[in-house]
UniProtKB/Swiss-Prot annotation:
Residues 33-44 have a biased composition (Polar residues). Pfam families: FAM104 (PF15434). Disulfide bonds: none annotated. It comes from the Eukaryota. Residues 1-70 are annotated as: Disordered. This is Protein VCF2. The lineage of its organism: Eukaryota, Metazoa, Chordata, Craniata, Vertebrata. It comes from Homo sapiens (Human). The gene is VCF2.
């Protein structure tokens, strides 16, 4: 049984006697698969204002308080977070984190006012 001799690889990865040219690996990432952190969104003032929901200035009940928190900047509310709330993903994440606290606080305020 005479087999073909096994050829050892050289350090550069090519086989002896192999006439194929080696191509360098590409380090560029496919733009389709970029991380969302790498992508920066820039919204013009027109787009930002048209994406907001028009809410009456004085809404009654706890829902009005929640809407006020989302749409109006407050001294106790970090500016970077308020700017992020113009994007739906940030709004959802923010309410997932702080929604239960806000609901609890507004229901306690309602009890205090009723007493």
């Amino acid at each position: 049984m005479g087999g073909c001799p096994v050829r050892k690889r050289r350090r550069n990865g090519s086989k002896e006697g192999n006439h194929h040219s080696t191509q360098p690996k590409r380090n560029k990432r496919n733009p389709i698969f970029q991380d969302s952190q790498d992508t920066e969104f820039s919204w013009s003032d027109n787009e930002r204002s048209s994406s907001r929901i028009n809410i009456p200035e004085r809404a009654s009940g706890p829902e009005g308080n929640l809407n006020q928190i989302v749409t109006e900047p407050d001294a106790n509310f970090p500016q970077f977070l308020h700017e992020g709330l113009s994007k739906p993903v940030y709004v959802i994440n923010w309410f997932m984190s702080f929604g239960p606290e806000i609901k609890l606080n507004t229901s306690q305020q309602g009890r205090n006012q009723a007493v």
